[in-house]
Every structure is written in structure tokens, then in C-alpha cells.
From Swiss-Prot:
Organism placement in taxonomy: Bacteria, Pseudomonadati, Campylobacterota, Epsilonproteobacteria, Campylobacterales
Pfam families: KH_2 (PF07650), MMR_HSR1 (PF01926)
Protein name: GTPase Era
PROSITE patterns: G_ERA (PS51713), KH_TYPE_2 (PS50823)
Organism expressing this protein natively: Helicobacter pylori (strain Shi470)
Membrane topology: Peripheral membrane protein
Amino acid sequence: MKTKAGFVALIGKPNAGKSTLLNTLLNAHLALVSHKANATRKLMKCIVPFKDKEGYESQIIFLDTPGLHHQEKLLNQCMLSQALKAMGDAELCVFLASVHDDLKGYEEFLSLCQKPHILAVSKIDTAVHKQVLQKLQEYQQYASQFLALVPLSAKKSQNLNALLECISKHLSPSAWLFEKDLMSDEKMCDIYKEIIRESLFDFLSDEIPYESDVMIDKFIEEERIDKVYAHIIVEKESQKKIVIGKNGVNIKRIGTNARLKMQEVGEKKVFLNLQVIAQKSWSKEEKSLQKLGYIYQRNRD
């Protein structure tokens, strides 16, 4: 069997649809999805097998990254640093831009990335045909920069094989790097953590999801049930009260929603215990961020 394998960094501005694309390719709910921008905070490896037209069985290891953005808060700097690291580690990059975006995001990407890349224009199902053609024409001025230009819709599964074909074409022949049926090398407790975070974005408004995070305190994995003990961390006591809600109604909704998604992903029953704590300025303190698993690479220039 002829095989290829390689790491592919998936880069884009917030809300470009990176996580939706990966979940569609995997036919599973692993990457956090929200209609709110900047939901993804940590790099996640997602493994997609694909047989290309040349007969290669390719193992495409996508590096799902936080959206490219610049803010002074240390948490946001951690997120940007992970996206930059993924670009450096990958053999190939895919820059995903919404059909509704201007060209500034792609121009910023070009200033940051020296790796070969594919430009993918997403959400074409949300625009009329003329608008899609116009956007593709605008990107043609950069034709010497990208390997291929692929319009697609993750929601409608349009042109996804074309994207995978382009990626596989530019990967080097190699033995597979992971087991055949593995979709991610993430630990299940880390996937569960992201599911809880997704529920925060689903049920809380305004700034609270952006000023909150989740810590798994204890994870017990049994044959028929996973037991998850976690706490939600916010920055203010007033936010804690909102997360809990009157008579605990909000935390119950968040917990139920998260638990059902966990059971779907883990394919077993899940017991979930959620607590809420307030810790002022946690998103600005390096030690607090390290405890939550964030890595900040300082610029040493």
C-alpha cells in the first residue's frame, strides 16, 4: 500500500469555520464550535484518512489552531503563539477565509507564514454565486503565493474532497504516524473539557464565555461510565452568579448539554459534577494559564 502522512496547520481569522470543517471531515464532534468568534483556544490534532487519485492512502494530521488575532491580554497572546507554532511545525498550511471576509486576514497570514499553503474560501453556501466568483477573483492577485485556491462549504460538504486531494498531492510519501482508526491523539478528559467550554458559549452571553475556562479536577474512566469532576473558572463574583443562575438553572443547563455531548463522543454514560469559582485576573496571570494548560512562547528577539 502506498502511503503518505503529514502535519497540516489549519489557520484563519476567528469564526472562519475551522472547527466546523474539521468536525465535518471527521464525521464527529471533536473541535469546539460556536457562532461566537474566538472560541478555539488550544491547538488540537485531528487525523483524517484520505485515498487520493494517485492511489496513495494519506493520513492528514490537521493542527486546529486558535484564530489569528492580536490582543494584549496574556490569554490571547498564548492563543496566537500556538497558531504561530503550528505554522512552524507543519509541512503544509491551509488558510481558511470566509467568503465574507476582506483580504486583510490573508495578507496578515502571508506576512507570518513562509510555508507552502492552500487558500480555502469557506461558507460559499451563504453567498450568491456572483459573490463567490468575485471573492475568488480578488484572491487571484495572490496566485503566485498559494498552491491552490479551493472554495468550499463545510456545512453543505461541498468541495471537501477537492481540498483533501490538494493536501494529499503536496504531502511527502511516508508511513502513517498514527494508528489507522485514530481521530485524535487528545486525551478524552481534554476533549470533555472543550465540550464543557462549548456549552459555556452556547448558554452564556456577552463577555462571560471569553472570561471563563474549565479545569478538570478528577477524571475516572471506567468500562461503562466516565466520571468527570470539573470547575468553571470566571473572573468576577457577579459572573459566577450568572453562570450558576437562579436556583442553579444555568449551571444545570450547561451541565446537561455538556454531558449529552460527552456521551455521544465517548460512546458511554458520563457522570458530570460541575462547580464554579471566581478568580480575579486569571486570564492575565502566567501561572494560572499554565495550570489550565496554556503555553506562552515569549518572543526572544
